[in-house]
Regions:
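Carbohydrate-interacting regions of secretory-pathway proteins
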Residues: 23-205
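Positively charged n-region of N-terminal signal peptides that target proteins for export
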Residues: 1-5
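Bacterial N-terminal signal peptides
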Residues: 7-19
Length: 205
């Protein structure tokens, strides 16, 4: 057998024996649907699990302590590059958010970013409406559903780039100058808000 034929045969064998390296880790659940295992309560409020969803209520009003930015749950570990998918629902006149790569010092909405969640279906998109990176960049469209209906969001963070897809529409594509590694968080902004989260999954890139 010539060297060329042997090399070709060896290549074919290795192709079947050695699995390809995946582009990123397989998605995993951040919420088991039963309890708050894997999550840490920050700054009070009431967090519970009901009917397969995390519910946040009786939050700490941020105006009494701006450094805390309301009550929130955070992940036990920090994340850098990832695709985060979840569903959320907010009550009438409610205010909540999703913290992305936030630190524990000062306000997590400004160490990392906060994806805003509001009861604002049909409103003009601004830097503080649903899907926006709060006080930084508005969504291109307000894709939020009416109060108490479930919304599906996908957030992709890779390096300095943050992309958000809400209810099937790409609405944010932004280059950040803030932390590129930190905690993920679920925020309940104040005592009036009742926010729900479910089907929380992450794939690290």
């Amino acid at each position: 057998m010539t060297n060329t034929r042997f090399a070709l045969l060896l290549g074919l064998v290795l192709a079947f024996v050695i699995p390809a390296t995946p582009a990123h880790a397989a998605p995993k659940d951040l919420f088991n649907g039963r309890d708050l295992a894997g999550w840490v309560v920050m700054h009070g409020g009431e967090w519970l699990v009901q009917d397969g969803a995390i519910i946040g209520r009786n939050g700490t009003n941020w105006t009494t302590n701006p450094e805390k930015s309301g009550s929130w749950l955070r992940t036990e570990k920090e994340y850098s590059d990832f695709v985060l998918e979840l569903e959320f629902a907010i009550n009438a006149k409610g205010n909540a958010g999703i913290f992305l790569r936030s630190g524990l010092e000062k306000n997590p909405a400004f160490t990392g970013h906060e994806m805003q969640i509001l009861d604002d279906h049909g409103n003009e998109p601004k830097k503080y409406t649903t899907g926006a990176l709060y006080d930084v960049v508005a969504a291109t469209k307000n894709m939020s559903k009416p109060a108490n209906e479930w919304n599906k969001v996908r957030v992709t963070c890779k390096g300095k780039r943050i992309q958000i897809n809400l209810n099937g529409e790409d609405i944010v594509d932004y280059q950040t100058d803030r932390l590129t590694r930190g905690y993920l968080g679920l925020q309940n902004h104040d005592a009036h808000a009742v926010v729900k989260f479910r089907h929380i999954r992450i794939a690290e890139l």
